[in-house]
């Protein structure tokens, strides 16, 4: 269609005549195919002509139009058209004979090359038709035909070397290449290679082009032979030689004309007109030639048919399978136009336009012909064809004027270059050449009827081009710039095939820019660096970056639009801005027109319409999200942080002592607080917790809870208890949002000022439990702290702060709070330790040792503290005596109950009473009260011990707790707990652990130390039930024994608190229990248990020398491969549910990997964590076997004892294991049972 438009404008007519010369080369390469092609082409021509004739009128009309257009005599135009037609016929004949007359072919190709389009000009219409045909088959009837004609030239050169092959191909392609052999000539191949080299087309495209040409040529050859029988080819052959020379002259003329044309083309409009004039001048001869061809042979008949507008189509269809598509387009063309020549001219013009249009989608209305032709071909080789067609046409025009493509067969090279972008660049190049030539020629005949249409098209196109020229040309020019002027547009067209929009908008424009650009660029292979690129550019401009929707490169910032801006419809590069849009800035040129990505479109925008977002402003998104989850944004300054934790009174102290920024502040340690004379234990705990959270946030800024933990923790700390609110599950609580509610509930329920302050802070982000805990814990903690005099300072810290901390912790992350509590506890006296006893560790450890225990106390808080307590528990367990453990247990229970919820506070207190009564006598019973189901120490203990029981108890404990306290307490606790994620968040667990280590647990300790300790135990009871499974020591044994057991089991993990203690806080069972409990309780429990359990697990792993960051526990990608046997053993040793142990082990593993800056892929769930059981086939050593059964710490022991090979494993005995130094009965049993089982697989593996 564009061709038509282009032809109409004027440049096209010239190109059309020029295409005629190409036919000559076409004959050169493939005389017979030329004949067959001629016939096929004549059919195509007929179709085209029919279309053109039908819609555009007859040849006479076209000639008249040309005459009018060129201000020349009608008879001259007719003569010229006749000449062209004759030439074309002779060329067709020659095409048949060119094989026979290489000289003429060479001459033609040389002339064509020299003229660029000469060949096309002199080429008879038949040849034009052939190219058209090819074009159709490839690109579209007309578009491809034209460009094929151009290409034909090129191809002819190629075909010279590969005539036979080319012929076959030619037949398939029919005209553009039919003239030459199906195989490309060397020149054509060179062109293709050049195109590939210049990245105009890919190698694949070039190969595809070759194949397509061959296939089409073969078909065409088949057709041609059929045609030859008609005699059309022989006739052509006869006149072919003469025509060949004639063509040479004509080509020379045309080349001159085309050069002029090219210059004109450079000025798009003038070029067009001149092209048309040239076309007219050439066309008359072309038409004459074509008529001759028709007369001469059936091909002529076909041509006549073309003129008639019907005959050719059938032939075409019959002629070549590939042509049918062309035919379809042809038939479309044919029916509209009665004058085949006119049609052809129109077609050519259209082809030209069409090449563009075709490439783009044949949608341009002005290029109706092009569209018709284009569709069939378009489908076939829309991309290549179009790019070639358009590019080639443009190039052809440029080439003709430049004669630059001469080297490669006239247009072919240029076209090819242009079409390099397209897959079949050579064919396209030829076709493009043909298109141009045809356009040039056809305008002559086609000008008559086409003339009017062409004129209108021209005018329309001109207007469009002039309008769009700025935008489209700029786009296309950008394309042209990217590619040599015209080629880019042509290629864009191909690419735009799918985007008719661009084509329509820029088809003529493209032609023009192509022509103008091509005139200068045409010679340049139009390396068109990549028409595709330019296409893309233009497409982008026009279609809004369809090509590269999302820009994936680096951005140099972001900007928020503050003023709406709607760009001009002609400004395709500018982004449409709406207030509030966020633009990702790609570049900020100093001129002020920045480039950015908005709504998946890359474009430009003026910096004055936007406000650049600073990094901080951009980050709010995350914090906002977190806030939505109930997490406050990270504090931005020390002042902000102190304000959040309600300790602004210390601001001057920090600022005057060099703590001006958070980076310095997060290095704050307890000794520094002493130096700064900050003595208030609560304040110290809060500050240390805030520091921990800051550090955590930095190391783990992305882990959901850290930031919030910091804020919440800080807030909670400022509120009430320092760090004890280890209940907070940063990740889970935040995630579920239940935590928030829980904290709110707690805040509501807690009436204590400290609790209120804490809850106030906590409400926002922490679970209720922490709040309640903090209230209760504060009250109880204060009381208990008083009770534990020595502990008092720290205890109050531990106690009150624990409550607060717990809350904070729940909000932020239990571990931090707990850790601080532990640290604080460490500082605090025994009593302090006791409150921490909340944690299993605390319970186990003596009051003095209980410093850590408090951490455990914190841990008991189901929410998050549990995890921390576990850690604390580990350390405190060692330290604390069983007695203390029981006391701690009570304290823990108390603390936990407080933490669980303020409503629970009452409950906790009641529980405390009962637990204190029974629990004081027996710590285990207190744990049981946790379970509530079994208030009796024994019963409670048992419950705590069983993981399932623990879970049930956890639930029950919640219920129990509340029953002990009040329904309100229960409800509150349940509410709070549901708010807390049922499972402890992995991060929180880690954090808990760390916090425990830091001594965050002190909070619970204070409360547990005092009578309220029963209260604390209540909470611990909850936790205890879950806890009991957590710690191996938390065996269902007697309550009294439990502490011992706890210590004993604790001993292995050294940090493990006494059994009952473990049960209470440490018990992952709490976690487990938390899971089973309500969502809220589960979460709380899981948090508390998680903290405890994580600490216990980590300490146990450390004691056993198991490095989870190494194989087989973690592979090089950070995936988990913890053997199930190890998880099972730890679950037994820690008396915790396997699920919790597995989750904690994975958290530990991930944390350790991250500390090593290694990739860490957390695994989800027990099955995934243990999904890599060591298969017997993988066991190659005793060490591997021990790892597979979860007892890797005995590798050295067994090796020392002489068991160094797998063959010795089956012979292991109880005695030899004891002699080797393995004293743990369960481990010995495991080893023996595994050794017995190993007898089967070991055979091969035994070493």
Curated annotation (Swiss-Prot):
Compartments where located: Cytoplasm
Keyword Cytoplasm assigned: yes
Protein name: SAM and SH3 domain-containing protein 1
Location, primary (coarse class): cytoplasm
Pfam families: SAM_1, SAM_2, SH3_2, SPIDER
Result of altering residue 617 to K: In CAPOK; affects the regulation of cell mobility; patient fibroblasts migrate better than control fibroblasts
Region Disordered: start-end pairs: 1-39, 126-145, 221-257, 316-344, 449-573, 616-639, 713-810, 846-884, 903-946, 971-1065
Lineage summary: Eukaryota, Metazoa, Chordata, Craniata, Vertebrata
Domain SAM: 633-697, 1177-1241
